[in-house]
């Protein structure tokens, strides 16, 4: 088995090794070394990337026999090569993974829930728990987790003997029996884990919950740690500052100011809908019963009002009642209704005539078209014909 240098020193950034094997693997090459600093994918954490000799390391996987590095160029078996991991990426992941251990340990000790899923993604960290917690409860955990960071307690890794392991209490999703690597965050968590971690909690930096949702009878939470949490804070602070300036209110008053705007918008929409309803009544007064079709091209701001107009107009038309809104330049949206024709069957003919797309029920279809207004009116003036 490949010697795991990342187990010995999680902060080491480069190393030298001997190439034991290099096999073509599609467009990549599978390289096995006598020792490696590259962490293979496992435990919810993606593999390290970086450079190895003159090749880029694209992925790393572990098998029962060896750790396999997938590179974009071949390496010569027997050669000594220098490798370097993508350190900023590794450190970010160590911050996140160690932060997850603290949170999971606290959730278990405070509320008795177990971590049943973990994924360290490119932009966020996702954890699943086998029970529900409220947002205030998660904020309590967040406060305790950040207190752990401020205390700067050590994080230790070890491979205890089977005898000692049998006497230990630790978290684990799997039933492990040998070569169990235990990660201990002193006073907060003891967990079986194969991944690199920071050396002390102070290296983690800020820990922040960003969301929670119900998931498979429990909850799924997302967090950010360290550098990622700082970036997120800067971006959100900039957004709040911009909103504060646009609304001419203090940053602490942005939420109530936005709520006032939303209330005003709701009132304006209600008033506009009432005006549209009155306008529909006036439109209908101009219509007369006809054995042919009715076609109106007008401004309909409310889709509900547009449908109401068609519902009323189709009672007067022996053919169809067609309502269009839009412009020749940007195209039109339409709703067409009929009490005498099967519009689902007629949709193909209608759309072909007005360069449209759409469909619906036998009594009503809706869609869009690009034909100009004159062509639309000319078609419906003669539709459906005899």
Question: How does the language model describe each region?
Answer:
Residues 1-386:
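A glycine- and charged-residue-rich anion-binding loop/surface
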């Amino acid at each position: 088995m490949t010697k795991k240098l990342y187990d010995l020193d999680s902060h080491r950034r480069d190393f030298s090794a001997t190439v034991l094997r290099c096999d073509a693997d599609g467009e990549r090459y599978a390289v096995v070394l006598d020792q490696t600093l590259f962490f293979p994918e496992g435990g919810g954490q993606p593999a390290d990337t970086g450079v190895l000799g003159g090749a880029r390391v694209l992925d790393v996987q572990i098998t029962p026999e060896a750790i396999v590095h997938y590179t974009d160029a071949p390496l010569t078996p027997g050669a000594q090569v220098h490798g370097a991991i993508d350190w900023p990426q590794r450190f970010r992941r160590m911050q996140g993974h160690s932060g997850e251990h603290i949170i999971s340990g606290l959730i278990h000790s405070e509320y008795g829930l177990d971590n049943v899923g973990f994924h360290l993604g490119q932009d966020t960290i996702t954890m699943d728990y086998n029970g529900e917690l409220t947002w205030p409860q998660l904020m309590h955990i967040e406060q305790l987790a950040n207190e752990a960071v401020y205390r700067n307690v050590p994080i230790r890794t070890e491979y205890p003997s089977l005898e000692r392991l049998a006497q230990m209490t630790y978290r684990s999703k799997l039933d492990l029996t040998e070569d169990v690597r235990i990660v201990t965050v002193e006073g907060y968590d003891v967990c079986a884990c194969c991944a690199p971690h920071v050396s002390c909690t102070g290296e983690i930096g800020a820990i922040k919950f960003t969301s929670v949702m119900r998931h498979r009878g429990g909850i799924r939470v997302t967090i950010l740690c360290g550098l990622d949490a700082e970036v997120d804070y800067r971006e959100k602070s900039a957004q709040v500052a911009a909103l504060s300036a646009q609304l001419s209110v203090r940053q602490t008053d942005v939420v109530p100011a936005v709520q006032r705007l939303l209330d005003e918008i709701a009132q304006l929409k209600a008033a506009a809908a009432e005006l549209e309803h009155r306008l529909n009544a006036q439109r209908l007064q101009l219509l007369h019963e006809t054995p042919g079709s009715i076609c109106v091209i007008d401004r309909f701001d409310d889709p509900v009002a547009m449908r109401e107009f068609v519902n009323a107009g189709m009672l007067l038309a022996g053919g169809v009642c067609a309502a269009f809104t839009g412009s020749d330049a940007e195209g039109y949206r339409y709703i067409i209704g009929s009490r005498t024709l099967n519009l689902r069957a007629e949709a193909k003919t209608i759309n072909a005539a007005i360069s449209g797309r759409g469909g619906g029920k036998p009594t009503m279809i809706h869609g869009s078209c690009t034909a100009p207004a004159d062509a639309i009116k000319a078609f419906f003036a003669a539709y459906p014909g005899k």
